[in-house]
C-alpha cells in the first residue's frame, strides 16, 4: 500500500534482490517508465549497478526535449476494473490490445492464454493507478539526474519521428554523449520492441554484456 514513488519502488527492488540472494552489481534492463527508476537507482547506489540496457526507456528530460508536460493520470475508480471483471472482459473481447505484437507462432497458445489471465487479474490494479498518478512527481524528483559518465549504457529505440524533426534517436544521443561506453540500437517498430525484435536485441545484448567483462 506504499505510495509508488521512485524512492519506494527502488528500495523495494533492492530489498527483493537482497531477499532472493541475488548479488550485485546488477545490469538493469528498464523498459518504458522504469527508465526513471533505473536512473534513480544508478545515481543513488552506483556501486550496485554494473550497466543499464534500456528498451525505449522513459527519462525525465523527455518532457522538456519534446515539449510535452502533460502527464497521464487515472481516476481512483479504475483500480476496480480487475476485481469486478471488466479487465477480464477486455482481455477476451479486444485481445489485440493486450497481447504481444508478434509474428504468428512466436508465442504458444499456452503463452497467450497465460497473458490473458495475467491481464484479467492485474490490469490497471490499485498499484498501477497509484504509479500512474505519481509519474509527474517522479519526473520532478529525477529531472536533474543523468547517467553517470562511467556507467555503461545501451539503449534500444524505435525509429520514430516527432514534430519539428525531433526524434527519440536524437534525444537518446544527447543522453549518451557524455558516457564513455555507450551504444544506441535503432529498430523499426513500436514501444514494445522486445515483442518483435527479441532475436536482434538478444544478439546486441550479449555482445554488449560480453564487452563488460
Regions found by a protein language model. Name each.
Residues 1-29:
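Active-site loop/oxyanion-hole signature of alpha/beta-hydrolase fold enzymes
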Residues 58-90:
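A catalytic-pocket lid/entrance helix-loop region that shapes and gates access to the active site
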Residues 184-199:
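Catalytic histidine-centered segment of alpha/beta-hydrolase-like enzymes
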Residues 14, 39-43, 202-206:
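Short, hydrophobic alpha-helix immediately C-terminal to the catalytic nucleophile
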Residues 195-209:
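Post-His helix in hydrolase/transferase enzymes
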Residues 1, 63-69, 73, 167-168, ...:
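Short aromatic-enriched loop/helix-cap "lid" or pocket-rim segments at secondary-structure transitions
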Residues 108-178:
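Conserved serine/cysteine hydrolase catalytic core
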Residues 24-66:
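Conserved hydrolase catalytic core segment
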Amino acid at each position: 500500500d506504499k505510495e509508488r514513488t521512485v524512492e519506494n519502488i527502488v528500495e523495494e527492488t533492492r530489498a527483493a534482490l537482497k531477499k532472493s540472494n541475488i548479488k550485485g552489481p546488477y545490469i538493469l534492463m528498464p523498459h518504458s517508465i522504469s527508465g526513471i527508476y533505473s536512473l534513480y537507482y544508478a545515481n543513488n547506489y552506483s556501486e550496485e549497478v554494473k550497466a543499464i540496457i534500456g528498451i525505449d526507456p522513459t527519462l525525465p528530460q523527455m518532457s522538456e526535449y519534446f515539449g510535452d508536460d502533460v502527464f497521464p493520470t487515472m481516476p481512483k475508480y479504475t483500480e476496480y476494473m480487475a476485481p469486478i471483471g471488466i479487465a477480464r472482459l477486455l482481455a477476451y473481447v479486444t485481445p489485440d490490445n493486450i497481447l504481444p505484437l508478434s509474428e504468428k507462432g512466436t508465442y504458444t497458445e499456452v503463452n497467450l492464454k497465460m497473458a490473458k489471465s495475467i491481464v484479467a487479474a492485474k490490469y490497471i490494479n490499485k498499484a498501477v493507478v497509484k504509479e500512474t498518478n505519481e509519474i509527474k512527481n517522479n519526473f520532478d524528483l529525477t529531472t536533474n539526474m543523468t547517467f553517470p559518465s562511467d556507467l555503461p549504457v545501451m539503449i534500444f529505440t524505435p525509429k520514430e519521428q516527432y514534430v519539428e524533426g525531433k526524434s527519440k534517436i536524437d534525444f537518446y544521443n544527447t543522453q549518451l554523449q557524455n558516457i564513455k561506453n555507450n551504444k544506441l540500437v535503432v529498430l523499426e517498430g513500436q514501444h514494445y520492441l522486445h515483442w518483435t525484435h527479441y532475436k536482434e536485441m538478444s544478439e546486441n545484448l550479449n555482445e554488449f554484456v560480453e564487452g563488460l567483462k
